[in-house]
Each structure stands twice: as C-alpha cells, then as structure tokens.
C-alpha cells in the first residue's frame, strides 16, 4: 500500500498544495503551527473518515472558504485508486472513489489503511474509557469496514432509547397518565430488544479484536521493555458474556437491562451497553493508568501501535501507512530505535518533527524531507 500523491485544497491552512511522495519514508520538517499535522490529518481522514482532533467538517475548511477537498492517488496490490473527500460548510461531505460518487461511507472505507501515533495517544492509558473505546472502534473500522455501519446502528438505537427513557421519567411524575405510561413501557421493551441485538454485534467484535491484538502487543512490549515488564490487556464489557454466540450475548444484554430497569427509569438514560465498555492495561500486575510511569505508559502505547500495524497487515494482506505526529521527541533513544527498526523497509511512513537530530544519517539519506512553512510545502 503506497500513497503516491496528496492534494489539499482549502484544507486547514493549505490553499492549494500538491505533494508527491517518492520515498517510503517522508519527514515533514517545520516549526509548530505551520501545518505539519494537517497533512497527517488529511491522510487519517482518507483512512477512517474521522479525525482525532475534531468532529466538525467546518474545522477542516480554510477560513473564508465554504468548500475544502482532499484528493489522493493510492497504489495497492490490486491496482491504483483515486480517492477524494469534498468537505462543505454548510452541507454534507461527498466521497468519490475512482471519480465515481459514493452514496455510502461503507464503500469508501478500506480504500486506504493507516495507523496514527501521536502524543495524544497517551490518553489510551491515562484518559477516559471513551478514548479507549474510540481507539478500538477506529481499528475495527479498518479491519472490517461494515463495523462502521454496525456502530452507527447501535448509537441510533441508543439515542432513541434514551429519548424514550427521558420521556418515561417525566410521565412517571405526572398524575392520570397510566395509559400513556403503559404504552411507553411496551415501546421500551421493543427498544430493549433492539439494544440487545445491535449492542451484541458491537461487543462481540470488540472482544474478538482485543483477543487478536493481545499476543502481538505483549510480544512488542516485552521486546521494548527488555523483558522486564509483563503486559496484560483485559476487555471490560459493560455486559458480561461467556460464549461468542449471538443469542447468548443478546440474552445477557436483556438480563442486565431487566436488572438495571429501575435505575434507568430513575436516571432517564441507558446504563447498559457497549457505550460503557472499557479496556484495562496492567504492567506486572499493576494498573498502568494509575501507577505506570510516563516511560512505562509510552512503552505500552508504542507496543499497542506496533501491534495495530501487524494486525492490519495480517488481516488485509498489505502493510498500512504509519503516521507519526511529533512522537519521536516523546520517546527515549531505546524506544525510538525500536520504532525506527520496525518501520525500516516495511511501512510507508510519514513523520512530523521540528528538528532532524533524532534520526541517524542512514535514515535521513533514505527519506524524503519536506519543509513545511505557513501552509506551504517544498523539498528541503
């Protein structure tokens, strides 16, 4: 998998920028706030249709413009593809693949695969459960694009069910509304079933991907830590289940919904489901979130990212792109060397940095170095 060209039009701080990538490794060099990370964000959008920096398309578009665009040419084992994302404010984004307009995001996902690693990824360890769920979901979408649709279905059901629970709480405090309350309870049972069906699809897939990721991450972690640390990763589903069978998992959902029925009605919101899942990391039996040093946390995140690379490569049959956003400065020489050694000759890699002294001479000689200044890119 190789990104040959990238064109940014009214995207972030770029008015018009064409970039041709002629090496497997590209170093984007420049001071802060010049636009280095914006290039990586454009690639991330092509791979996942999401950004870890914002959820609003308006934020991607150059100030004063109403339309922005990212276009790219990708080379894969099965041939070359042209990708384009057109962003509008106001309006909805449009996607094209080989100049054909796509009606569904699902048809675009999987065209390009990429793993992003930035200093923000330390939130995987020390951040909220939401950060870990987003990480899992982003990985799953790349491994199995249909998962984006499955996740969307679940959150649609969740929103509808929450709206009904909110109404139920209000109805329960009003007199003379017993018939209305009865009708709402009947409706709630229908949404219970929908929540169990869609939620079981989400939790089963999350459990499977964690199961595949664990041994890969443990091997990398052991190598990087010099065999001094043992990493354990546990998926903590909000609804516990034993056998990976659709009906059994759905029954576990319905049982927990019944168990939490009163609490949900009092709170007016859904407290059962994968929107409350978490992942726990422990190092030598100690929770990494609370007690891990910054060095240990960085080792853990690096091991996870290397495991992601390997897993995507195993599943799709091609190495994904690797996006390293100002991360080398965050790593000590040992971790830097581990990372650079893995990359060498295998993954097309894009690295942002403010200086070049982290790289050895051989690395610099085999890399394309681009200078980024105020939304303009040119060779060094």
From Swiss-Prot:
Binding site residues for ATP: 30-37
Transmembrane segments: none
CDD domains named among the record's database cross-references: ABC_RecF
Principal place of residence: cytoplasm
InterPro entries: DNA-binding_RecF (IPR001238), DNA-binding_RecF_CS (IPR018078), P-loop_NTPase (IPR027417), RecF/RecN/SMC_N (IPR003395), RecF_2 (IPR042174)
Subcellular location: Cytoplasm
Keywords associated with the record: ATP-binding, Cytoplasm, DNA damage, DNA repair, DNA replication, DNA-binding, Nucleotide-binding, SOS response
One of the record's GO cellular component terms: cytoplasm
Example GO BP: SOS response
Coiled-coil zones: none
A GO term for molecular function: single-stranded DNA binding
Pfam families to which the protein is assigned, alphabetical: SMC_N
Task performed by this protein: The RecF protein is involved in DNA metabolism; it is required for DNA replication and normal SOS inducibility. RecF binds preferentially to single-stranded, linear DNA. It also seems to bind ATP.
Homology family: Belongs to the RecF family.
NCBIfam families on file: recf
Annotated protein name in UniProt: DNA replication and repair protein RecF
Species: Rippkaea orientalis (strain PCC 8801 / RF-1)
